[in-house]
Protein backbone atom coordinates (compact mmCIF):
# COMPACT_ATOMS: atom_id res chain seq x y z
CA UNK A 1 0.00 0.00 0.00
CA UNK A 2 1.26 3.47 -0.90
CA UNK A 3 -0.03 6.69 0.66
CA UNK A 4 0.65 10.35 -0.14
CA UNK A 5 -0.01 12.99 2.52
CA UNK A 6 0.68 16.72 2.30
CA UNK A 7 -1.26 18.79 4.76
CA UNK A 8 -2.59 18.25 8.27
CA UNK A 9 -2.50 14.45 8.02
CA UNK A 10 -5.00 14.47 5.17
CA UNK A 11 -4.27 11.54 2.82
CA UNK A 12 -4.12 12.77 -0.76
CA UNK A 13 -3.92 9.33 -2.32
CA UNK A 14 -3.98 5.72 -1.12
CA UNK A 15 -3.25 2.79 -3.44
CA UNK A 16 -3.77 -0.83 -2.47
CA UNK A 17 -2.00 -3.70 -4.21
CA UNK A 18 -2.67 -7.45 -4.43
CA UNK A 19 -3.57 -9.40 -2.35
CA UNK A 20 -5.25 -6.50 -0.48
CA UNK A 21 -6.69 -4.59 -3.44
CA UNK A 22 -9.80 -6.79 -3.61
CA UNK A 23 -10.19 -7.44 0.12
CA UNK A 24 -13.26 -5.99 1.83
CA UNK A 25 -12.28 -3.54 4.55
CA UNK A 26 -8.61 -3.36 3.51
CA UNK A 27 -8.79 0.37 2.74
CA UNK A 28 -10.11 1.13 6.22
CA UNK A 29 -7.65 -1.24 7.90
CA UNK A 30 -4.66 0.36 6.18
CA UNK A 31 -6.01 3.85 6.85
CA UNK A 32 -6.02 3.04 10.57
CA UNK A 33 -2.50 1.64 10.30
CA UNK A 34 -1.26 4.81 8.61
CA UNK A 35 -3.03 6.99 11.15
CA UNK A 36 -1.24 5.10 13.94
CA UNK A 37 2.09 5.88 12.24
CA UNK A 38 1.57 9.65 11.95
CA UNK A 39 3.03 10.39 15.39
CA UNK A 40 6.17 8.46 14.47
CA UNK A 41 6.36 10.47 11.24
CA UNK A 42 6.26 13.67 13.31
CA UNK A 43 8.94 12.47 15.72
CA UNK A 44 11.31 11.43 12.95
CA UNK A 45 10.69 14.63 10.95
CA UNK A 46 11.58 16.81 13.97
CA UNK A 47 14.98 15.17 14.36
CA UNK A 48 17.44 18.03 13.84
CA UNK A 49 20.26 15.60 12.99
CA UNK A 50 18.34 14.16 10.04
CA UNK A 51 20.12 14.80 6.75
CA UNK A 52 17.99 12.61 4.52
CA UNK A 53 14.40 12.48 3.36
CA UNK A 54 14.23 8.75 4.02
CA UNK A 55 12.68 8.26 7.46
CA UNK A 56 13.17 4.50 7.27
CA UNK A 57 11.11 1.99 9.20
CA UNK A 58 8.41 3.89 11.06
CA UNK A 59 6.39 1.08 12.56
CA UNK A 60 6.71 -2.71 12.55
CA UNK A 61 3.14 -3.79 13.19
CA UNK A 62 3.82 -7.50 13.43
CA UNK A 63 6.09 -10.07 11.76
CA UNK A 64 4.66 -9.30 8.31
CA UNK A 65 3.38 -5.68 8.20
CA UNK A 66 5.69 -2.67 8.36
CA UNK A 67 5.28 1.04 7.60
CA UNK A 68 8.13 2.96 5.95
CA UNK A 69 8.27 6.74 5.50
CA UNK A 70 9.72 9.53 3.37
CA UNK A 71 9.25 13.28 3.76
CA UNK A 72 10.14 15.91 1.16
CA UNK A 73 11.61 19.31 1.94
CA UNK A 74 8.15 20.84 1.48
CA UNK A 75 6.52 18.54 4.02
CA UNK A 76 4.86 16.12 1.61
CA UNK A 77 4.90 12.67 3.16
CA UNK A 78 4.93 9.31 1.45
CA UNK A 79 4.28 6.09 3.33
CA UNK A 80 4.64 2.54 2.07
CA UNK A 81 3.14 -0.35 3.99
CA UNK A 82 4.85 -3.64 3.20
CA UNK A 83 3.16 -6.97 3.68
CA UNK A 84 5.92 -9.55 3.70
CA UNK A 85 3.56 -12.52 4.00
CA UNK A 86 5.13 -15.50 2.26
CA UNK A 87 8.48 -13.80 1.67
CA UNK A 88 11.57 -15.17 3.34
CA UNK A 89 13.97 -12.65 4.84
CA UNK A 90 17.61 -12.96 3.90
CA UNK A 91 20.34 -13.45 6.46
CA UNK A 92 21.53 -10.31 8.17
CA UNK A 93 18.48 -8.21 7.34
CA UNK A 94 18.27 -5.25 9.68
CA UNK A 95 14.51 -5.33 9.89
CA UNK A 96 14.02 -9.08 10.00
CA UNK A 97 11.35 -8.68 7.33
CA UNK A 98 13.49 -9.26 4.27
CA UNK A 99 13.87 -5.53 3.59
CA UNK A 100 17.04 -3.66 4.46
CA UNK A 101 17.17 -0.01 5.50
CA UNK A 102 17.30 2.08 2.32
CA UNK A 103 15.89 -0.56 -0.04
CA UNK A 104 12.70 1.44 -0.47
CA UNK A 105 14.63 4.53 -1.53
CA UNK A 106 14.11 3.91 -5.29
CA UNK A 107 10.35 3.55 -4.77
CA UNK A 108 10.18 6.72 -2.67
CA UNK A 109 12.24 8.69 -5.21
CA UNK A 110 9.96 7.50 -8.00
CA UNK A 111 6.90 8.52 -5.95
CA UNK A 112 8.39 11.94 -5.31
CA UNK A 113 9.10 12.36 -9.04
CA UNK A 114 5.52 11.36 -9.88
CA UNK A 115 4.21 13.91 -7.38
CA UNK A 116 6.46 16.64 -8.82
CA UNK A 117 5.15 15.84 -12.31
CA UNK A 118 1.61 16.14 -10.93
CA UNK A 119 2.40 19.55 -9.43
CA UNK A 120 3.81 20.72 -12.77
CA UNK A 121 0.50 19.96 -14.46
CA UNK A 122 -1.21 23.34 -15.06
CA UNK A 123 -4.65 21.74 -14.61
CA UNK A 124 -3.87 20.34 -11.17
CA UNK A 125 -4.83 22.64 -8.28
CA UNK A 126 -3.11 21.50 -5.06
CA UNK A 127 -5.23 23.77 -2.86
CA UNK A 128 -8.42 21.84 -3.62
CA UNK A 129 -6.98 18.93 -1.64
CA UNK A 130 -6.63 20.78 1.67
CA UNK A 131 -8.77 19.97 4.68
CA UNK A 132 -10.45 23.39 4.41
CA UNK A 133 -11.57 22.58 0.87
CA UNK A 134 -13.08 19.25 1.87
CA UNK A 135 -9.95 17.12 1.69
CA UNK A 136 -10.51 15.67 -1.79
CA UNK A 137 -8.12 12.97 -2.92
CA UNK A 138 -5.97 13.15 -6.04
CA UNK A 139 -7.90 11.92 -9.05
CA UNK A 140 -5.31 12.62 -11.77
CA UNK A 141 -5.20 9.46 -13.89
CA UNK A 142 -1.53 9.88 -14.82
CA UNK A 143 -0.46 10.11 -11.17
CA UNK A 144 -2.61 7.15 -10.12
CA UNK A 145 -1.27 5.07 -13.01
CA UNK A 146 2.33 5.93 -12.11
CA UNK A 147 1.79 5.06 -8.43
CA UNK A 148 0.31 1.72 -9.50
CA UNK A 149 3.32 1.09 -11.76
CA UNK A 150 5.75 1.92 -8.93
CA UNK A 151 3.90 -0.30 -6.46
CA UNK A 152 3.87 -3.26 -8.81
CA UNK A 153 7.47 -2.80 -10.03
CA UNK A 154 9.19 -2.54 -6.65
CA UNK A 155 10.56 -5.66 -4.98
CA UNK A 156 13.32 -6.02 -2.36
CA UNK A 157 16.67 -5.54 -4.06
CA UNK A 158 15.37 -3.43 -6.97
CA UNK A 159 17.58 -0.37 -7.43
CA UNK A 160 15.63 1.48 -10.15
CA UNK A 161 11.85 1.76 -10.33
Cite the ranges covered by each PLM segment:
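Fungi-biased regulatory scaffold/adaptor regions
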Residues: 1-14
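Acidic, low-complexity cytosolic segments
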Residues: 14-161
Amino acid sequence: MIETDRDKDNPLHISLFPPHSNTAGAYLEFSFLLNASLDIFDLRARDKNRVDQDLGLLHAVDERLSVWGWETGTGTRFAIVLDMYGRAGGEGDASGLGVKEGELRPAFKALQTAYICLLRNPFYVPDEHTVAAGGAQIKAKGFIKEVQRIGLAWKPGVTVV
